[in-house]
């Protein structure tokens, strides 16, 4: 069903036991894939934000939700990363920056042939002072572990839940000559 936004596609639905097919014309559009499942106040001063993955819009979605909760009186936050399998490294760095002080190491990358690259907090995040609890489980992995690990390393918050997946690392795809890639 992929195609240019605004173009149309004709669908024919054949159903078992029904002679006449259903005919539909569907207009293609961009389907947003959001990272935030929920954000609301659970107590007068405590907000809750659930992130299901780290995508291109995660930092923007988080800031919007956090600003809304702060306007409602949020001083403390519960960040739910349970079941979050990770995603974009930059999104994890941007999120961790919201909680950490200037020049605090978030993560570093290093490979057999690549030099070490350190990623530090800028110290300009909007939630550097309130109490922070991060919820994790056995399905919390990769970028989620980078965020929770940085928060734990700098004693910025409390990590609550089950032992996470154990994949707090960065994978770099390798392009192959036939146009495919491996991780």
Language-model regions, residue ranges each:
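Cleft-lining beta-strand/loop regions that shape enzyme active-site pockets
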Residues: 1-180
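Carbohydrate-binding/catalytic loop surfaces
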Residues: 183
């Amino acid at each position: 069903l992929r195609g240019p936004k605004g173009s149309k596609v004709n669908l024919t639905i054949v159903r078992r036991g029904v002679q006449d097919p259903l005919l539909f014309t569907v207009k293609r559009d961009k389907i947003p894939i959001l990272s935030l499942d929920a954000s609301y106040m659970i107590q007068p001063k405590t907000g809750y934000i659930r992130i299901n993955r780290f995508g291109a819009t995660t930092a923007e979605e988080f800031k919007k939700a956090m600003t809304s909760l702060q306007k409602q009186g949020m001083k403390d936050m519960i960040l739910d990363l349970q079941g979050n399998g990770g995603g974009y490294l930059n999104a994890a760095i941007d999120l961790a920056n919201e909680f950490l002080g200037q020049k605090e190491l978030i993560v570093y990358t290093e490979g057999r042939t690549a030099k070490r690259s350190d990623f530090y907090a800028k110290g300009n995040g909007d939630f550097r002072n309130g109490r922070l609890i991060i919820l994790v489980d056995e399905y919390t992995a990769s970028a989620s572990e980078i965020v929770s690990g940085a928060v734990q390393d700098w004693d910025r918050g409390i990590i609550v839940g089950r032992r996470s997946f154990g994949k707090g690392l960065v994978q770099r795809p390798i392009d192959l000559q036939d146009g495919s890639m491996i991780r």
